[in-house]
Amino acid sequence: MILKSFLLGNLLSLCMKIINSVVVVGLYYGFLTTFSIGPSYLFLLRARVMEEGTEKEVSATTGFITGQLMMFISIYYAPLHIALGRPHTITVLVLPYLLFHFFWNNHKHFFDYGSTTRNSMRNLSIQCVFLNNLIFQLFNHFILPSSTLARLVNIYMFRCNNKMLFVTSSFIGWLIGHILFMKWVGLVLFWIRQKNSIRSNVLIRSNKYLVSELRNSMARIFSILLFIICVYYLGRIPSPIVTKKLKETSETEERGESEEETDVEIETTSETKGTKQEQEGSTEEDPSFCSEEKEDPDKLDETEEIRVNGKEKLKDKEEFHFWFEKALSTQLFEKKRWNRPLRYIKNDRLENSVRTEMSQYFFSTTCTCGKKIISFTFPPSLSTFWKMIQRNISLCTTEKLSPKDLYNHWVYTNEQKRHNLSNEFRNRMEALDKGSLALDVLEKRIRFCNDENEQECLPKVYDPFLNGPYRGTIKKGYSRPIMDDSIISTEDSTGMVWINRIHGILPNLSDYQEFEDKMDAFNEELVSPDIDHSLNSISELAEESRPSLNLKGLTLLAEQRRLDSENQMKRLKFLFYAVKTDPNDQTIRNKSIGIEEIGKKVPRWSYKLTDDLEEQEAENEEGSTEDPGIRSRKAKRVVIYTYNDQNINTHTSTNTNSDSDQAEEVALIRYSQQSDFRRNLIKGSMRAQRRKTVTWEMFQANVHSPLFLDRIDKTFFFSFDISGMMNPFLRNWMGKDPQFKTSDSEEEEAKEKNKKKKEQKEENERIAISETWDTIIFAQAIRGSMLVTQSIFRKYIILPSLIIAKNLGRMLLFQFPEWYEDLKEWNKEMHVKCTYNGVQLSETEFPKNWLTDGIQIKILFPFCLKPWRGSKLQFHHRDPMKNKVKKENFCFLTVWGMETELPFGSPRKEPSFFEPIFKELEKKMRKVQKKYFRVLKFLKERTKWCLKVSKEKIRWVIKIVLFIKRIMKELAKVNSILLFGLRKGYQPSETGKDSIISNKITHESTIQIRPMGWTNYSLTEKKMKDLADSTTTIKNQIERIKKDKKKIFLTTDINIIPNKTSFDDERSESQKHIWQRSKKRSARLIRKSQYFIKYFIEIIYMDIFLCTINIPRINAQLFLESTKNLIDKYIYNNETNTNKEGIDETNQNKIQFISTIQKSLSILNIRNNNSHIYCDLSFLSQAYVFYKLSQNQEVINKYHLISVLQYHGASPFIKHRIKDCTRGIFDSKSRHKKLPNSRMNEWKNWLKRHYQYNLSQNRWSRLVSKKWRTRVNQRRTIQNKDSKNLDSYEKEKDQFIHYEKENDCAVNSLPSQKEKFKKHYRYDLLSYKYINYEDRKSSYIYVSPLQINGGREIPYNDNTPKPESCYVLGDIAISDYLGEESIMDTGKNPDIKYFKWRILHFFLRKNIDIDTWTDMDTGTNINKNTKNGINDYEKIDKKDLFYFTIHQEIKPPNKKKNFFDWMGMNEEMRYRPISNLESWFFPEFVRLYDTYKMKPWIIPIKLLLLNFHGNENISENKNISENENINGNQKKDLRISSNQKEYLELENRNKEKEQPGQGDIRSDARNQENLESDAQNKKKYVEKDYAESDIKKRRKKRKYKSNKEAELEFFLKRYLLFQLRWDDSLNQRMINNIKVYCLLLRLINPREIAISSIQRGEMRLDVMLIHKDLTLTELIKRGIFIIEPARLSIKRDGQFIMYQTIGISLIHKSKHQTNRECREKKYVDENSFDGSIAQHGKMLVNGDENHYDLLISENILSPRRRRNLRILMCFNSSNENIVDINPIFFNENNVRNSGQFLDEDKCLDTDTNKCIQFKLFLWPNYRLEDLACMNRYWFDTNNGSRFSMSRIYMYPQFRIS
């Protein structure tokens, strides 16, 4: 037993060790390398096959092995690898060598020195064989590419410790493989030589010298193979000719044009081997902002020199290099592959092209948390620099610390830091206790200012010190006034600066004071010493060698874009002078640098390339004509129309001819549909970098690599489409079986599909043919000339000769000739020359470059030879649907002179000349036949009649004879009976007996046989017939006997047997018959019953199904009708506006409801009779339907819907979300009760379930303080109890506007310090609520000033009337759906993927009169409102779109519910955005939600669907709400013209802390008064540039009227994508029209052609009805012109991180508690800490903004120091009780991820303890965004995707055991 386990265990471990050992892996890799066959094998085999002697064989093998050994050594030795692996090595070595070798083989006498008698090793040929094999082994292989193996090596070399052992073992493995391979080759060759069958082959025997010839020509065969290899390599190498150097963007130009530059990736897929060392060398980051250095090695050397020595030096070193050395090294081994990369892949329109050779991941060891770990995002530059230092510093000075010492040191330093911070914090707190002023104790923030008195500071938004390190980016695109207010710059400084690298990485802390003193100031004044703040953090991080540190990011300089005016800056720069570290005070460079966040600098190419399209755009605008650098798709420019006008020549005489020519041509671009894999490649770049691809199809969507052949579905040899073959069989089988019978509609659909497939197939074939003509050289010229020849031949030779022949024939047959008609038809035929695509030009005009681009010849009214004219006239009056045949009265000419309906289509069948003749002959023959057959028919009928009569007569005679015979028989019988009747009367006669017996037998037999017949149907027809015959004969006999008896036994005494009377017999017989019949029928019924049942069930099922389908339709119809009626009723009530008591509204509603149901039912019935039901279900959302149901208590109490809601399966009609929620309404406990009408009813409880952490999504995304919040606070505090009248409203409005103006200044663009303070206060309070969660019993973070669950309103004054919605729903979270703000805020939302262009609208609706969005109706225009003077339909001015309707009278709410005020959501509805729209409405409409925000819940969804397609005058009824009774004359509209709004967008988009271009309506509201007057002036330029589209102007450079116009142009271009949708509006009919127009324009008298083309239906009149000046508005309305927003990249900053982290927070039951009284009680009941919070909460509600409690003591410290303290507290958490509470929870195995948490039951009371622990563990004593910082500085994670990883899994590592 022991032996067994010992053996088994050891064997396994031994096997594992052997398999994982370096030697085995090396052997395996070496063996694999054997199969990587390259050109060297060719020479090795040549030496064997040619039998040139053993010396040559040995030298070949030796050279081969030596070459392979060199390759293996190159794996280990990086310089050799780099030399051999570069593609340019192939350029230099391979091609000349191959060519030389090729010629050497062909012309041996040039190099043949003759055989020498000396030592064979000195023989030149043997040496050459050795060299060949050696050198060829170094080249790239091409059967198994070495790059695949190289990647394997790279992976293993990174893991492997003993690299030399690996190289050796891999070489040995290769050697073994090679020996085996060569042995196998030798055996094969030996077998071929020895095999007799090959020699005795008939072919070889017939030519006895063939074998010797083959042997002699072997050298020639090898040289041919060598030539093939040459060609193969030629395709892979970069061109050795020096290509044009790309135009580099200079530093200033690059910075200037950066706004429009294109951010691209460069795909480099060279097949070189990259080792780790190569990566280290090549992936070094670009040290400067401008990547130009990498372009030129000279420059690189120079800058390195400058950086290392810290001074500016002369270029001394350069003199030591010879010029050709530099040039050669650059040409051959430059990393950038000479001039250019391979491919551009466009991403964005912001920056230069990214260089993707720079690896995103760089592995290196780093010291983190006192332990050495591998960091995968280590800066490569830091690594190389550290290696340089290590080389230069002697080894004795560096001592290696043990891991334990490192860890202890880390712990100690952390403790020290924490101790120092805590002491400082304590000191500050003590000072506060002693009564010091709070402002003195508070740690002050460092400001960035340009004078000592801090009078001129930067605005807070732009201050890099105030905004935190990860938010300190400089915003782009400032307008002039803001910039002037914020800072004054005298010159436009655009220099480059280098920071001393050594100083940055190894800072000397003692020099800090000196370092600060030596910094020069911005604008030649001292910068505040506080600049130390940012540099301090840099040095600390450098000291701790944080892996994610990247000092080169410091040299990033803000870019700027120069527009027409020279002085306008697009960017604000924060500049200060460079660092001085030289003792002589000489600056490194006296230029400015910009500080930006420390991050990875993306290396970029120093030039940008454009493609043809961009070049065309640039040409149109600026007239620049640079050659495009990127290859575009294959295309041909086809000129379809040239505009020749005398007047233009006079106007454009000043211009050059080429310009005017260009402007006057209208051309189409025809793209080739062929696979074009050169597309997007950079012209002149290396093709060697492309992967090996094979293109085997005519049209191949993607490039296929042979590597993935096995993945491709269809192989070449057997591509059997089994499913395709099965389909027809299945279809036939299903058609026959009655169970699988398909309906007619399905069959039609299938036919339609097949037809479409066929058409598609034909079209593909046509395209294939056209592309084939395009690809073959000179094919177009040949085809064109053939077409022209065929055209002439047809028109002038074939057709005239046919006409002559026909008419001569007619004359010979004595008929009138038709010369005139035929010649008229012949003249009518026109041969129109067309472009290759089929655009018609004219009969005489050929398309431009038709010999190269191709030509089509279209035949209009093709001549058709007919034997006589006028024969086809009858077809005109047929069914109009069949006229389609007549319509196509044209064709295209093929190369062979045939006719085809479409270019390159299959030739159509031409009508035969003789067919009508044969038809006519047939008709005549039929007439003759008809007459002949009539005669025959008559004769036939006569003969038939004669036969019939004779037959009848014969039959009659026979009958008479038979009758006589029967009478005679009967008489004989009667005689016998009369003689013996009295004696034998009582006995039954013999025949009677027999018959009875036989009858019994037959009955029995039939009874036995029948069941057998029922069960199986196997009785033959014959048997059945016999049986039937026998029964009938028996029946006849019985009847006859009965009759005889009746006749004979007339006397009573003869009746001896009393029961056998004749009547009884008859009755029994009839009963028997009935019984038998019933038996038969029941049996048949039983047999067929199952089919009846089945059929019956199916009918019932179908009926039920149809009923259920109709239910939602009927319901929807009812609600539609009721909605309309109730709106009408309510409007009527408002109009009358009297105080009379009407009917009780609820009853009225009920009556109205019932009447509408009846009415709509009748309508439905009528519709059912006439046509199918049609209801627009999109009118109402399901939520609204359920709401209406909940209001109607009778419906609920009857529980009609309970079964639907309780059904747990997939309900076909109700969305799951709504179904789940609605179950709350129909609670089964309250089954027999009426629904309570109390304030907290079930409906409201149900609504409470809809929350997003009880904050709307908008709220989470924007928890930072915004201007609107402060503004609304101020607005609220103005109001008092009597503020419902007009005056207070006016006052409020004025103050509101005044406040906005005040806030608009650039200096005060941030909220005041108090507001800032309040913001931090709220944050900290929120975090403290989390921390102290376990002390509070069940309360959630109710009391925080954010008012998360309490007053979700903004803090109000006690006197302020709160919005009605708070009362209506018992304070439930309406804000989950509607944002809190009253002015619509379209600020940053993390869910927005698009730039919200809907809010721009600018000139889009230019000519549409849209009634205000405040007017609402479900679709009817009610004009009676105008009677009472209520201006319901206030039209927006032609240019005005956005304005707000501010109501001046807000009446207290009435108690009765309004129809449309459901859920109380109409309070201030037009201002509230819907943040969670997707939860109830269909997600398709979410994109339109900006417009919808203004009037949510009431706008019929139909209007959203028909956004631009509605009527030109959309008018809607006024929003009528019980909460707001508004008189129209008291409305004031703050209107903003759309262009003005656009201008505002440009002015203000940089003020907001969001992406550039994300506009905000509030900015418009702020500036509306100032800009009201400019509206008319500003709209002109927009119209001018966009409303008109003029071909001639497009080519000229556009002169901007103003900078604003240019800015607008730039803005539109950059953030919006404009595209035309051609498929719909510019459809085939339109294109057909255009083709006809092209022809008509060229004709002198186009009338006839025009009329005929209209008759043929080729030119459609309805399409012709186009406005002369199509405005942009109409194009948009029709859906032709589409404006899409460019996708924005959202900056995932602190708010978003907070949103993400809170997303996994756990849900608690008590969260649903919403009663304010309960909450206030809770404030008092909690401990003192919560009490103070309650005070604070109440203080906020009281609106006392001047008083703040310093509740959160940490506010004394600055945020950065606060963060440091908290992080240190967290990691030295031994003092806290967090871990001690529940150590089990902190077991690493027990830590669950967020998914597990969310999968648990929603009610987490069962897991409360662990929840608390999780929260404490997740939220230690630091703010939410500190998590991001911790990730950045402690866990080396910069990426958000790894954020959750650290949050959930990494914390337990730091627990104190």
Curated annotation (Swiss-Prot):
Q: Where is the composition biased (Acidic residues)?
A: 256-268, 281-304, 612-625
Compositional bias of type Basic and acidic residues: which residue ranges?
Answer: 246-255
Q: Name one Pfam family in it.
A: Ycf1
Region annotation Disordered: where it falls in the sequence? 246-304, 612-631, 740-764, 1547-1579
Q: Where are the transmembrane segments?
A: 18-38, 64-84, 87-107, 124-144, 172-192, 221-241
Name of the gene: TIC214
Its membrane topology = Multi-pass membrane protein
Any single GO CC term annotated in Swiss-Prot or TrEMBL for this entry? chloroplast inner membrane
Subunit field text: Part of the Tic complex.
**Similarity comment:** Belongs to the TIC214 family.
Q: Which domain of life is it from?
A: Eukaryota
The cross-references to PANTHER family, in alphabetical order and at most eight, read: PROTEIN TIC 214, PROTEIN TIC 214-RELATED
Task: Report the protein name in the record.
Answer: Protein TIC 214
What is the annotated localization of this protein?
Plastid, Chloroplast inner membrane
Q: Please, one GO biological process term?
A: protein transport
Entry keywords, A to Z: Chloroplast, Membrane, Plastid, Plastid inner membrane, Protein transport, Transmembrane, Transmembrane helix, Transport
Q: Which InterPro entries match?
A: TIC214
**Broad class of the protein's primary localization:** plastid
**Function of the protein:** Involved in protein precursor import into chloroplasts. May be part of an intermediate translocation complex acting as a protein-conducting channel at the inner envelope.
